[in-house]
Amino acid sequence: MNLNDTFAAVQAAGRHLALLPDDRINQILNAVAEAALEQTSYILSENRKDLERMSPDNPKYDRLRLTEERLRGIASDIRNVATLPSPLGRILKESIRPNGMRLTKISVPFGVIGIIYEARPNVSFDVFSLCLKSGNACILKGGSDADYSNRAIVEVIHQVLRQFNIDTHMVELLPADREATRELLHATGYVDLIIPRGSSALINFVRQNATIPVIETGAGICHTYFDEYGDTAKGAAIIHNAKTRRVSVCNALDCVIVHESRLSDLPLLCEKLKADKVIIYADPSAYQALEGHYPAGLLKPATPESFGTEFLDYKMAIKTVNSFENALGHIQEYSSRHSESIVTENPERAALFTRMVDAACVYTNVSTAFTDGAQFGLGAEIGISTQKLHARGPMGLEEITSYKWIIEGDGQTRQ
């Protein structure tokens, strides 16, 4: 397989995007949103073909599944992107040097962005809308689990692009096989940035094999620390929401850390989890506090593997600590640097937590479920970065632009 011709076509299409006015881009985005709704039956029928090949018990199943409601949400997100100001051509810095040169630093597209993702067909729409709005061409490399869905979505997008006389190569879907992934990771000279979205195994593979820049959107091993000064009602609501709102996403709660002085509150903190049949892997102290108060079939002794696991399922761990410092230590050891939360009524404790915890998103008395581009007012997200360069946290339009310097003068030469 040689995809260089495909990569070159995407690159060429990307150069023309820079010439599209923002109002034209917004028209295209709104048309794609409308097409997604008009072709709901087609998209869902193709999605069902993917679902039929996967067990409903697979943690990826919920991510893979599209519904009419989810497609309405996707269309709404695309329309929201259209309402956002263009991230391009913004003056980031300007100055006049002593010799009269005028320097202007302006935002520009990356060029071509490659996205490697697994069983999440909604990503195809998200990536397209953000890349179009930011003037980037995009190469989609979806997993085989979602191949029917991704092909249907890209076909819907291409239909709209053709209506607007836009080169359809601006969004290209690669074959769903590993050889295509390897070629994409080595597309030096064609692709400017790779963003992997998926399991830690996928992200590690991309990091270890790519010869072009990568922004990691790491696994979400998320903790909520119920502090000795925590409010029980708030804690119960936050834990339930963070764990059960949607278990298959990266901002879902994986481990509750509880101060030993509040072990007697554990039954109340976990009460709402019973209805969702959440399996709890509890350390000895937490197990003893929950025994007789939580269904025996759902309460398991924790093992070393219980901590540091992204469950993506109706499962979570509980760790007991005897100090705030030990809570920080546990997070430091097991966190994926995605989203961490504290439940406390002590302002000093909250401030110290936000300063000391090294994560992209740090919450005080808030569910980690809010780590999301739309919730942050970004319209949508191309991923949630857990690294510190070039972006961190939910990545919206600004995070998928770069910049260049424009230098204007009147014949200046350097001595």
UniProtKB/Swiss-Prot annotation:
Primary location group: cytoplasm
GO biological processes: L-proline biosynthetic process
EC number(s) given by UniProt: 1.2.1.41
GO CC aspect terms: cytoplasm
Record's subcellular location: Cytoplasm
Catalytic activity entry: L-glutamate 5-semialdehyde + phosphate + NADP(+) = L-glutamyl 5-phosphate + NADPH + H(+)
EC class name: oxidoreductase
The keyword Oxidoreductase belongs to this UniProt entry's keyword annotation: yes
GO terms assigned for molecular function: glutamate-5-semialdehyde dehydrogenase activity; NADP binding
Pathway(s) served: Amino-acid biosynthesis; L-proline biosynthesis; L-glutamate 5-semialdehyde from L-glutamate: step 2/2
Keywords, alphabetical: Amino-acid biosynthesis, Cytoplasm, NADP, Oxidoreductase, Proline biosynthesis
Function: Catalyzes the NADPH-dependent reduction of L-glutamate 5-phosphate into L-glutamate 5-semialdehyde and phosphate. The product spontaneously undergoes cyclization to form 1-pyrroline-5-carboxylate.
Family: Belongs to the gamma-glutamyl phosphate reductase family.
Protein name: Gamma-glutamyl phosphate reductase
